[in-house]
Every structure is written in C-alpha cells, then in structure tokens.
C-alpha cells in the first residue's frame, strides 16, 4: 500500500482543507489533468467549452491518481456543515510519509493541532472543551503561526503527550529555499508550470459553500507543483537517502548546509570524545580583530604596490558586524592590467567584457584552480574556533579533506574499470560466448558499480561538509562561530593567491581574471616554462596544489558571467555524427562551463527572466547562429516555448498590482496577484503595462517594465500567435554583446586586443635593488627564496603615477617630459 504523499493545507475562519496526492501518481494521468485544466483556464479567459464537463473529468483523474481531499466547513448563517474529520483520522491509521512546501513551519503544525483536538470534537466539528469550532481553533493558530514565524511548534503544550502519525519532509527546507524566502509560486514559474495562482479568496474571509470547490482546486494545483518540484529534484532526494545510509545519519529532511553540519558534528564528536551536547551551544564572540595578529609570516611580495597593500592590510582593524565602510574588510587596487577587489567573499578581478579565442591569439588560455583551497587554508594557517579543541578540530578537517579525495579517486578508478568490463561483456555477447563467463563478468561489473557509487556518495557527503565549514565560522547560530577564523582564512588565502598573480605578471604572463580560488592566464608558447616554474614554486612554497584546465574560448561579460569552452570541444563537436540536441547537450556538459547570465536554467531562488536570451547568446557565441534568428524562431520550437520569453515579478504586500491596458479604446484596470508572469508584447496588438501602487502613497506609481507593452501570462493559454515584441529580446542580447550605450563596452566591441592580452607592462618589472626598498626576489633556477625585512609603512596609492612609484603627479609628468623609463 502506498503511504507516501505530497500534501498542502488551507485554513480559513470556517474552513479546513487538506489535499494528499500520492508520490507515485502516474505522470501520464498528471499530464492529462494539466491538459484538461488548461482547457478550463481557456474557458475562463473567454474561449468556448463546457466547464462543468471538464470539472468532472478533473475529479475522475484525481480519483485515478489516488488523491485524497478532506474538508471541514461550517456556515454559521445557514447552519450547514461538513466534517471529514473521521476520514482524516482513518487516513492516518497507517503511518504516512508526507512531503510539503514550507510544511515544517506550517502544514505539519496545523495537522498536529487538528489531530490532537480531534478527540474533543462533536459530529459537526465543535470542540466541546473550548466551545469553538475546530476551523476557528485552527484559524487562530494559523494566524499566530504566520505572525510568530519559525519555531511556533515549540509553543504547543500538548506535544509531549502527542504521537505524530506521519513523518513530514519539507522540500523547501531540503532545497534551502526557506533561507531565501522563495515562495511556491516563484518555484512554479521556474518549473514553467502552466498555472500561477495566488490564493483565490483572502485568507481572513468566511467561505461560502460555493467557494469550497475553488479552494480545493487551488490546493490541488499547489500540491501538483510540489510533486513536480520533488520529481525535478530526484537526484537531490536520492543523495540524502544515500548519505543517510553511508554515514549512519538521517539527513533526509536536511538542506545541504544541515547535512554538512551533521557530518562535521559527528566527526568532531568522534575525534574529540566530547558529547555533542557539550559543544553544540558554544561559540566565540569577537568585537575587533587586528589583522596583523592573523597574517601568515610567509606572505611576501616583490613589487612595491603589493608590499604597500600588505602593510595597509596588516595595519587595519576589523570591527565585526559594523556597517561602516571603514570598519569592513575591502580593498580595491590595480595590478597589471587588472583591477582587483579583496573582500570577505574572496579575491575577485573586475573583468571587462570580451571574447578570447586561443587559436586566434596564438596563445594558451589556462585556468588554474587551487584544490581544496579553503580546507587546506584552514590547516595551513592553523585555524580553529577558540572554544573548540585544536587537535580534534584539525583532525576533523584533515579527515574530511583527505578521505573525500581518496573516495573521489576510488570512485573514478572503479568507474573506469566498470566501463572496461562493460565493453568486454558486450564483446562476449556479440561473440556468443559461454553464458557463465558473461555472468561472472557481469557480477564483477555490478560489484564495481556498487562500490563506485558508495565512494562517490562518500565523497559528495564530505564535500558538502568541507564546503560548509568556512561559512559556519561566521554563522552566529553555529557552534563553529568564531569571526577570527573567517578573516584568518580569507585574508591569508587572498594574499597568497596574489603572490601567484605577482610572480606570473613579473614573468610577463598576463593574468586576465581572478575569482576566489583560481586565476585565468594567457600564456604564449615561449612562456610555458616560466609559467610552470612559477606554479611549481608557488605550490611548493605554500603547500597547495593547482589544477589546470585549458580553454579554446573564453567569452565573458564580467568575472561572474562567462562561457569557458574547454580544449577539445570543437574537435569532439566536429566528430559528432548525430548532432541531436541531446547529443550536443551531453557534449556541452563535458566541455563547457557557464556562469551567470549564460546559464539557461534559472535557479529557484533567482528572478525568472526570459531564458530565450541566454539561449540566443549561447547559440550565437558558440555556434555562430544569429541571435535574432533564435529570438524569432524559438517560439515555434514547442508549445511550451512561450515560457522562455516570460519574466516574473514578485512584489511586496504593501503594493497594489494593476494591469493597465487599453480595451476598445478605453482605459482598463485589472487587479493582479503578488507573483506574476508576463512577456513583452507587440504594442500594436496589446497595449498594456503592469504598475505597482504603494498602498500608503497612492500617488506613487511605478511601472514593472518601463517603455514596453506587457501581457500577463499567469495562466497558460495556447495561441497561434502570441504577438511577442521580439525587438525587446534582441535588444537585451545586443546590450550584452555590443554594450548598453557608447560608454559601456560589450563583449564583441572589445574583441581586438582583449584585456591588453599581448601588451607589455614595463611597470611590473621587479625593481633593481630589492634590498633597498625592502622587497624580495625569487630565483626559480635554484628555488632560493630570500625574504627581506619590510620597508617603512607607505599607504597604497592606486593612481597611475602612484603605481609607477612616483610621490606626486607633478613628479610623474616631469619624468614623462624628460623621457625617463617608467619602471619601479
């Protein structure tokens, strides 16, 4: 018998409704239900059809799915009532596994309250103990729960006597969407769901009998969205089940962050021998941190500008939690052709847009990432929260890092062996070999696959744990909280990465991008030996390991928005015989890395904005397909393609949302819901705009998309022509490719000498007398690194004349007039 369901609860002053749909509901039935419901929406929007027949068809489909809907309702005026309470209790005779959205903070609690109160209810649903109807009791708790927020269940005094007849899984919590306050409607838009509907009747209204159907129908839509979400995240759900089995910790109802915490806690408890209850509520608060007290003595630079930076950083004091700019850790400076930002989130370069193709510049575009940068940094700089034991914590970090690497390599090795055996099995089958030989090989292959999967799960679980540690240092609610750890790790690692950038630039190797734990360089053929020497020295000196990737193309808008095409893609693409979308997508997964606005799949916690634009940009930049062609033709690729032109907008409750349009020559205002989906339409067909009006300042009106005609598309309506304004989407592509205006460069506009890639920066040459200025030199031939005492404190000067080492702009101008060399 199926005991796993998706569910959702709706509560009004005189109505309690709950819908359950089996997790195993046949997808074909769901698809038919959606098709029927789309016809219902079309009728509601003016198309012809028999709505009552379609409602009956929907009811039959829900029955075929195994859906359950229970209603408790009373009309205080007419005396009519409905009480499905006994049916709800029958439903819970067997323990159920329920999955909801935000259910941990609401639906689960409301079910608990109902089940606990059931024993006091009469046949109509009145609570004999409190002299209230159960719907009123639930409504009061519902309002209190929403107002209170997370943790309302702790206020319920019956829990110690109550045994819950179900297990609740909250998919919002599992996917960490509760932390970003992502609503189910926002998720539905990202899932390209056909029906985006907010509550049909205000939550504080009394429900009439004729309204019950609309509430139930609305709730079915929400439950189906939740089911669609869970099915789309199958890999995440299965990962939690596998990690639970592998580590012996139940993480099935946890976000990735909580999984990491659970694994780390288990390991620290094991290595320290301290019971978790004795350290889970500990932390180290700090007010001020002197940066000089946390800097590594190994941080040294050869150039004046970076030595000045080091001194300035060392002299600074961080005020934890301060909102003042002067108290924060943030520095901007120019080095080489790049402008860098040091901040709490890591080192980043301020990258200009452009296209870089290795074959055209006759050089290698190489990305080097530091393996396990932050975990290794924690160990290298001896970082541990002051309130925890040093050695057990270091053992926890070391075990997590090393075991993850071992498990990752073991999984990869076994997978290769499995593939080899798989090919052998197929060869034997084709040659009609003895079945016993095939069976033996198959058994070995199955064992390898099982072992590889276990190692992969272990590696993934430990990766989650290790990635979380750094963030936990600055989470005031976590037992790893110690802000000093955060700054000790990030500041030292950023300066350490700058050491690599410096030695590369001093060898004439251009660094064109830096992002947290890696850098991208342009390397001429004659520079390969120098590049290797620089990287080898840096790895040995800092005890870090670099991982290298060569790119055929590096196409970027900025540091966080780019397409990186790995070496070998074009050759693999040319050899691809069957260039189906599926085959190309598989190839792209192997060779292409996208970030930011070039990712076509929109994250649930991000605003939904026209996926057709990144699709058009990708096809243009990778396959030379004119972006205008994609914008105009994609709409004909499928019935669902209209979603790729849509934009979403969620507005605050303090605003009224109005769709203002011209209908038959007259101004027409239609009130919209808080979450809306729309697309840009041809003004000659549909002249309308979405405006938001501040309830407290009615005269203050803002348009959602200025200077454009928009058409709401909350309900999917199939049309032969949606009258899309293609020019809007083409302009969005053009802004990225050619710049928003004359002052803002685009990717294509600076294609020539990208990033000054082949230019010489003489001011980056080491000074001739390092001892005189308190700098140091690196001799790569004998690996002899000598450090000189720091020079006198000099503040950072980011002006052009300051970078060249002049004390004033006048001195710099005189040097130019005299024809002096502008070296350090």
Please place each PLM-identified region on the residue numbering.
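C-terminal, non-catalytic extensions of nucleic-acid polymerases
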Residues: 290, 494, 528-824
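Conserved DEDDh/DEDDy metal-dependent 3′-5′ exonuclease domain
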Residues: 36-182
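Intrinsically disordered, low-complexity coil/linker segments enriched for acidic/polar
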Residues: 26, 46-55, 431-434, 805-808, ...
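Helical catalytic core of nucleic-acid polymerases
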Residues: 179-181, 199-203, 337-499, 505-507, ...
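Conserved "right-hand" nucleotidyltransferase catalytic core of DNA-directed polymerases
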Residues: 10, 187-198, 204-376, 500-539, ...
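Short catalytic/ligand-binding loop motif for oxyanion handling, primarily in non-cytosolic enzymes
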Residues: 15, 105-110, 177, 375-376, ...
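Two-metal-ion RNase H-like nuclease active-site motif
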Residues: 2-11, 170, 366-368
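Short secondary-structure boundary/capping segments
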Residues: 20-22, 113-118, 244, 380-385, ...
């Amino acid at each position: 018998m199926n005991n796993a369901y998706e569910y959702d609860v709706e509560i009004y002053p005189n109505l309690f409704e709950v819908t359950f749909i089996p997790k195993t509901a046949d997808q074909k039935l769901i698809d038919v239900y959606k098709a029927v419901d789309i016809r219902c929406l079309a009728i509601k929007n003016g198309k012809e059809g028999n709505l009552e027949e379609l409602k009956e068809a929907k009811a039959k489909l829900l029955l075929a799915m195994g859906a359950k809907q229970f209603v408790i309702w009373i009309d205080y005026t007419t005396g009519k009532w409905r009480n499905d309470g006994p049916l709800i209790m029958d439903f819970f005779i067997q323990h159920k596994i329920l999955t909801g959205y935000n259910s941990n903070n609401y639906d689960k609690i409301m079910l608990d309250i109902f089940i606990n109160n059931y024993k006091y209810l009469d046949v109509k649903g009145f609570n004999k103990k409190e002299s209230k109807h159960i719907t009123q009791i639930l409504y009061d708790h519902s309002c209190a729960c929403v107002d209170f927020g997370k943790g309302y269940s702790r206020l319920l005094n019956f829990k110690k006597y109550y045994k819950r007849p179900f297990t609740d899984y909250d998919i919002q919590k599992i996917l960490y969407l509760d932390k970003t306050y992502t609503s189910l409607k926002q998720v539905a838009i990202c899932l390209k769901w056909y029906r985006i509907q907010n509550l049909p009747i205000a939550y504080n209204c009394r429900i009439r009998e004729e309204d019950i159907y609309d509430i139930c129908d609305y709730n079915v839509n929400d439950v189906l969205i939740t089911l669609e979400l869970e099915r789309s995240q199958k890999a995440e759900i299965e990962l939690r089940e596998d990690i639970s089995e592998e580590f012996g910790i139940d993480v099935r109802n946890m976000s990735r962050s909580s999984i990491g915490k659970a694994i780390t806690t288990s390991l620290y408890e094991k290595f320290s021998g301290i019971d978790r209850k004795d350290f889970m509520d500990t932390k180290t608060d700090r007010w001020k941190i002197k940066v000089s007290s946390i800097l590594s003595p190994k941080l040294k630079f050869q150039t004046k500008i970076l030595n000045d930076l080091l001194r300035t950083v060392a002299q600074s004091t961080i005020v934890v939690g301060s909102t003042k700019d002067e108290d924060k850790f943030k520095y901007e400076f120019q080095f080489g052709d790049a402008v860098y930002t040091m901040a709490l989130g890591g080192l980043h370069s301020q990258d200009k847009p452009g296209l870089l193709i290795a074959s055209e510049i006759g050089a290698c575009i190489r990305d080097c990432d530091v393996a396990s940068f932050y975990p290794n940094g924690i160990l290298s700089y001896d970082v541990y929260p002051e309130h925890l034991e040093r050695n057990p914590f270091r053992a926890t970090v070391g075990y997590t890092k090393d075991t993850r690497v071992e498990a990752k390599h073991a999984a990869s090795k076994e997978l290769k062996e499995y593939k080899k055996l798989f090919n052998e099995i197929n060869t034997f089958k084709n040659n009609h070999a003895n079945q016993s030989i095939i069976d033996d090989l198959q058994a070995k292959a199955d064992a390898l696959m099982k072992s590889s999967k276990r190692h992969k799960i272990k590696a993934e679980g430990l990766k989650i744990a290790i990635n979380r540690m750094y963030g936990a240092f600055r989470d005031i609610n976590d037992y790893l909280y110690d802000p000093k750890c955060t700054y000790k790790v990030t500041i030292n690692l950023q300066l350490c990465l700058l050491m690599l950038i410096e030695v590369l630039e001093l060898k004439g190797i251009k660094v064109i991008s830096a992002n947290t734990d890696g850098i991208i360089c342009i390397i001429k053929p004659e520079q390969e030996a120098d590049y290797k020497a620089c990287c080898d020295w840096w790895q040995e000196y800092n005890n870090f390991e670099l991982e290298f990737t060569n790119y055929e193309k590096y196409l970027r808008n900025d540091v966080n928005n780019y397409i990186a095409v790995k070496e070998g893609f074009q050759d693999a693409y040319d050899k691809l015989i069957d260039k189906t979308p599926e085959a190309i997508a598989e190839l792209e997964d192997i060779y292409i890395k996208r970030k930011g606005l070039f990712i076509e799949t929109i994250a649930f916690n991000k605003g939904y904005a026209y996926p057709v634009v990144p699709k058009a940009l990708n096809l243009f930049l990778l396959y030379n397909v004119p972006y205008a062609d994609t914008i105009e033709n994609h709409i004909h690729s499928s019935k669902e393609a209209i979603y790729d032109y849509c934009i979403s907008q969620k507005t605050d409750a303090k605003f009224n949302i109005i769709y203002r349009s011209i209908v038959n020559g007259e101004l027409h205002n239609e009130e919209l819901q808080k979450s809306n989906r729309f697309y840009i339409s041809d003004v000659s067909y549909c002249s309308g705009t979405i405006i938001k009006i501040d309830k407290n300042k009615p005269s203050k009106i803002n348009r959602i998309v200025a200077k454009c005609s928009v058409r709401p598309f909350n309900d999917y309506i199939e049309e032969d022509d949606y009258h899309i304004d293609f020019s809007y989407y083409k302009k969005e592509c053009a802004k990225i490719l050619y710049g928003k205006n004359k002052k803002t460069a685009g990717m294509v506009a600076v294609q020539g000498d990208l990033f000054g890639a082949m230019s010489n920066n003489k001011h980056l040459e080491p000074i001739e007398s390092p001892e005189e200025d308190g700098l140091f030199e690196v001799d790569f031939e004998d690996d002899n690194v000598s450090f000189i005492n720091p020079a006198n404190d000099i503040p950072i000067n980011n002006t052009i004349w300051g970078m060249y080492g002049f004390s004033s702009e006048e001195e710099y101008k005189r040097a130019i007039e005299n024809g002096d060399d502008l070296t350090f």
